[in-house]
């Protein structure tokens, strides 16, 4: 039966007990990590959020010793005892490895059943089981450390931004649904039957309205929601570090955020981030890396060989060029002897990313070539191609030929795959960069129209405003993303603050004047009353902390994450609700054809 802790007051957390306390009486509380019964002595590893402290029970203590025999993993206990230097071997792996507490008083505050998995880091437990018993999983030291790191990050950001003049303001979570972007999570209104709120995908419009309201610098640690397919770095509910600034341009936003990141990484990780961070245009990022979030910790950059092969005899290359495409390649240094089976796997990978195929050329150590297309080209053409690729004996050259979008996607993905396989990435590097000058619009084959690459409120570059009426594909945006080691940490833009440009932007995206005012009338009305130039940025907090913690999945830095089908294995959400609730909301559940069958 559980005992009360009445009369006991914790004097220290586990790792707060140190050599300085030798000879003193302490009161500590926590969970039983491990029990070792040596006959006349029982050793208990006591665990709390800070770490492990060794407790010792001696058979000479009679009643306390007998009670200690009952202890099992995950029992919650409170003890009083004296700190002493360890008699036996010192445990260098523990902060408290050279001391122990000889226990005089033991209270069992709560017993535990045998947990479904050991509460320790080095255990091979299925992730679904970990998430089902997340409250146990969260006791593990790594997750304790990760969530403490997350807390440290948000605390630092709030303090730094407050000193920079930012005001923290909360924006609504019950919002108006808008059609652009990912699917909304909808919330039915009981008071307005048949009408719905949307949970915010971001506080975008509200933070712009705060600039209209004169708050100058806004920040919020904001919860956001998107009903989209999950990946390793995506969740249906996530957290943004959201900010907006008035009377600024791109350089001002970049400056404050570079200083924030530099100070935060130094304070929390003791990592020096050099400033200024590199900047490259979106076009340069795609041409060099095949990605708008390039990992610059290694080379293997894309090379455009279109001009070199445009008149060659290989129809795959020339055909792609004649259809308005390009031919690009990557040089995989020192892999010219790669077995054909591995090359075939690369070809399959390329096809999986949209390629019709993948051409390769191996440069043998004697300078001769082994290639899938050598017979279609003259020796001079091959030599020129190898020269353009800076090929040397022992190298493997890979080529894709198609529309730019496909070639970038194929070679960008291959570049990352090969870098991981060949262990080319220095995991100790923190390579930040800014990608700027994004296209304002991108063509959607599915919708057969231009859509906003970022969102409809991004300001075009002034010199490209003329193309809003003539050629949307030429319009560049005053948009910027911050990238770390191949992951987009955040993105932002200078916003449109003139009503006429905003209306023209919405018109270019296919909104009628009536639709624009129905969806965004409150913003367009605000533009009638004096709007400062403004810009902003939002970080994905989960992704940022994931990188800082050295994790590969954001679920490892979120207390209660969802799985890939957006469900919670611990609470079984989402779940059916009773008919009375549905009636109050005037909702009928329509069964799909498969359910009816």
Predicted feature descriptions by range:
Residues 1-597:
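Class II aminoacyl-tRNA synthetase catalytic cores and aaRS-like
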């Amino acid at each position: 039966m559980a005992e009360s802790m009445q009369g006991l007051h914790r004097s220290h957390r586990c790792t707060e007990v140190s050599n300085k306390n030798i000879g003193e009486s302490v009161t500590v509380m926590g969970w039983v990590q491990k029990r070792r019964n040596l006959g006349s002595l029982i050793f208990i590893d006591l665990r709390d959020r800070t770490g492990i402290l060794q407790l010792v029970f001696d058979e000479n203590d009679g009643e306390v010793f007998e009670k200690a025999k009952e202890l099992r993993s995950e029992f919650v206990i409170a003890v009083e005892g004296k700190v002493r230097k360890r008699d036996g071997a010192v445990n260098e792996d523990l902060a408290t490895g050279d001391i122990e507490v000889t226990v005089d008083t033991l209270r069992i505050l709560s017993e535990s059943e045998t947990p479904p998995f050991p509460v320790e880091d080095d255990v091979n437990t299925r992730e679904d089981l970990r998430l089902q018993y997340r409250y146990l999983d969260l006791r593990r030291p790594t997750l304790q450390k990760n969530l403490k790191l997350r807390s440290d990050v948000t605390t630092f950001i709030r303090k730094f931004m407050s000193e920079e003049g930012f005001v923290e303001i909360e924006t609504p979570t019950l919002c108006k649904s808008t059609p652009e972007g990912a699917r909304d999570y909808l919330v039915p209104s009981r008071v307005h039957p048949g009408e719905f709120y949307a949970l915010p995908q971001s506080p975008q419009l509200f933070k712009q309205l705060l600039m209209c309201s004169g708050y100058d610098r806004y920040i919020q640690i904001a919860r956001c929601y998107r009903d989209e397919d999950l990946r390793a770095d995506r969740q249906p509910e996530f957290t943004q570090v959201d900010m907006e600034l008035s009377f600024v341009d791109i350089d001002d936003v970049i400056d404050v955020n570079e200083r924030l990141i530099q100070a935060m990484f130094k304070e929390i990780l003791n990592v020096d981030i050099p400033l200024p961070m590199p900047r490259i245009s979106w076009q340069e990022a795609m041409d060099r890396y095949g990605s708008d979030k390039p990992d610059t910790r290694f080379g293997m950059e894309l090379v455009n060989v279109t001009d070199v092969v445009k008149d060659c005899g290989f129809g795959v290359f020339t055909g792609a060029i004649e259809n308005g495409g390009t031919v690009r390649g990557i040089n995989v240094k020192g892999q010219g002897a790669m077995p054909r089976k591995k090359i075939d796997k690369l070809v399959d990978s390329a096809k999986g990313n949209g390629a019709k195929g993948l051409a390769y050329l191996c440069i043998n150590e004697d300078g001769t070539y082994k290639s899938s297309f050598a017979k279609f080209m003259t020796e001079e053409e091959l030599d020129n191609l190898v020269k353009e690729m800076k090929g040397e004996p022992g190298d493997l050259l890979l080529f894709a030929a198609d529309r730019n979008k496909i070639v970038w996607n194929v070679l960008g993905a291959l570049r990352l795959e090969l870098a991981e396989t060949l262990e080319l990435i220095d995991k100790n590097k923190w390579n930040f960069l800014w990608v700027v000058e994004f296209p304002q619009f991108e063509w959607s084959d599915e919708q057969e129209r231009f859509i906003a690459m970022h969102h409809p409120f991004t300001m075009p570059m002034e010199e490209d405003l003329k193309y809003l009426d003539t050629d949307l594909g030429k319009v560049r945006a005053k948009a910027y993303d911050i990238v770390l080691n191949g992951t987009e940490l955040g993105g932002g833009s200078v916003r449109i603050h003139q009503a006429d440009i905003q209306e023209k932007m919405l018109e270019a995206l296919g909104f009628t004047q009536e639709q624009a005012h129905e969806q965004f009338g409150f913003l367009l009305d605000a533009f009638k009353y004096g709007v400062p130039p403004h810009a902003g940025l939002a970080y994905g907090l989960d992704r940022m902390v994931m990188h800082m913690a050295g994790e590969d999945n954001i679920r490892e830095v979120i207390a209660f994450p969802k799985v890939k089908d957006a469900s919670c294995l611990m609470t079984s959400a989402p779940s059916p609700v009773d008919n009375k609730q549905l009636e109050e909301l005037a909702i009928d559940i329509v069964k799909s054809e498969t359910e009816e069958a």
